[in-house]
């Protein structure tokens, strides 16, 4: 009973979003500024500006038309950013302030596909999908040149690095490179040697040599004085970008003699250095490529000495230029987040499994990202061991892997196991100590994997690769896919949930069947043991959550509230409450004792596949198909403290208001009553003020001293008062003061003024008509009073006259 009472006192009532990990790069161009401190990348309708040091998005720039950004470029002086949208508008930004300094039509008849600044940051060239190339003077704000002749989409433009030569290069879908003279306004030459799309152009320091790369798996060296190809270098991969390296020896990259060397990035996913004179590859990046690691973009920031690459998985990688040593990793887009877990003994990191073979580890404090390679197919599930240093992952490649994070936050794969014949969809780690893990697969079996003793040593570093795991127990558990497995807090029981609509309880380590939980109408997505009681929670595609007794396998409670499948469930508040997530994008907080849904959290836009709670039970983590990972903070205590402070303040102010009313200090009481949001008290105060002979002047003087928000509140009160004929006079008095003393522009700026006026008009007309009829009736009565003449009464006859009239 004492434990129950303590648990009730710790009931949670609300969570608030503390942080979001959202997409910031969805492919296309990415660019560093000259200092290497800021990274610019496209994400739909926005250009995001990242701080390289922290990985945080400093600012998002979005054009007024809210159309997708098709191209952008940053000037060499780092001052001006120009963006182009599908609405055929160009926007010039002062990006450091986040403001648009100029907006103009691109004049292209189709969206702008590429753009580039000249070395002086004065001219901007744009290439469109209409085959046209235009040149703009950014300083004087006019178009200078319009070049036609390119068939199809112009996807590449570049100025010659020598501004005195006034040359512009472009390439379209015909794989030719056109050289345009800005001085003669003509095409000087057409360079034809590529057989597929040209992807990049680079120029030597003296400006006499140009390097071009293409998807035809060759790079070509051009002599710009003769406009002839001097050498063709086969690189044996589709090249997306080629960069000329500085002409200085770099032994780490195989650059030992003077000459022209260039760096290529392509579909093999590795950076390679080539000697132009011999056509030989002198350096190949040691990092082995993996699925989705094809390089789609590469640039060199000479001043910062950094190479930036982008992968097909929308990851941005920064390398030190002289050694190609990896410096930074940024996960631009996680696609569909399938599972999330806190990582580290203090939950300092987050590991995310998305629709990719790679895992992403984020440090919550600094936003630093680490991308983990190892699986060869999509990772489906994660789980963390008790101490937080080790975690497990399973994937569609039919394998399970164990990863270790060191104290520096670096993660490496230390063990792997295989044996399932289909995708491994769920994994659970032992709870008491780091001794084993259990996996469930689409082959309808579960496997128990004991951890080797060598794996438990923190100093163990597998020099020869990950340790191989051997399954100790394999058991066929269900007739359909196993979606979830859970290990009891004492490591002696195993629960499995399947698409066959049942959950089963097994004894570990032999996997002996103890009982079956039946009652759901559709397949089960999640099973979870209570940390305090002998209870199992199951979440199903039928939209319900059920609690089951482990002793007799009976259903104790059913929670209904989700409109779609319930994908995850977790116990919080020492087993007295539940957190659940569903395919409707909602996260719900339930109190078990009364089956009540305490709070519904709506921050995701799609299926919430991942749900995990922190060790201290003060944070929750969710991941969804909308590519968002959200960190939730328990704000129950903060809200309760805030509510208590607010109530105490209300009591003090209410007492002050009562004192003012008792002392008949109505003018001060009016503002206080408005602040307390007491319409009836405000009405009483105004009625008291209007009983004074000088009511109009006092009411007007008091209202003029009110703040704008108080006047807005008073106007809202008037709407309610005006609906009652007994209080309409006070409402009209207040409205009259506002209309007489406030300028129309100020009144229209009030919050909700239009709705208030619409509500006031019909009742005001009705009151006016009623008062007009009353006034007419009063005038008619006054008229009758003044014009009414009463007849003079006749005098009564005397007794003698009466007697005389009776004689004959």
Curated annotation (Swiss-Prot):
The modification Phosphoserine is found at residue 257. The keyword Nucleotide-binding does not apply. CDD domains: WD40. Keywords: Acetylation, Isopeptide bond, Nucleus, Phosphoprotein, Repeat, Ubl conjugation, WD repeat. InterPro entries: G-protein_beta_WD-40_rep, Quino_amine_DH_bsu, Utp13_C, WD40/YVTN_repeat-like_dom_sf, WD40_repeat_CS, WD40_repeat_dom_sf, WD40_rpt. It is found in: Nucleus, Nucleolus. SMART domains: WD40. GO terms for biological process: endonucleolytic cleavage in 5'-ETS of tricistronic rRNA transcript (SSU-rRNA, 5.8S rRNA, LSU-rRNA); endonucleolytic cleavage to generate mature 5'-end of SSU-rRNA from (SSU-rRNA, 5.8S rRNA, LSU-rRNA); ribosomal small subunit biogenesis. Pfam families: Utp13, WD40. WD repeats lie at residues 64-105, 107-146, 149-190, 193-232, 245-284, 290-329, 332-372, 374-413, 419-459, 477-516, 519-560, 562-602, 604-642. The modification N-acetylalanine is found at residue 2. Its main location: nucleus. There is a cross-link at residue 407 (Glycyl lysine isopeptide (Lys-Gly) (interchain with G-Cter in SUMO2)). One of its GO terms (molecular function) is RNA binding. One of its GO terms (cellular component) is nucleoplasm. Part of the small subunit (SSU) processome, first precursor of the small eukaryotic ribosomal subunit. During the assembly of the SSU processome in the nucleolus, many ribosome biogenesis factors, an RNA chaperone and ribosomal proteins associate with the nascent pre-rRNA and work in concert to generate RNA folding, modifications, rearrangements and cleavage as well as targeted degradation of pre-ribosomal RNA by the RNA exosome. PANTHER family: TRANSDUCIN BETA-LIKE 3 (PTHR19854), TRANSDUCIN BETA-LIKE PROTEIN 3 (PTHR19854:SF15). Part of the small subunit (SSU) processome, composed of more than 70 proteins and the RNA chaperone small nucleolar RNA (snoRNA) U3. This is Transducin beta-like protein 3.
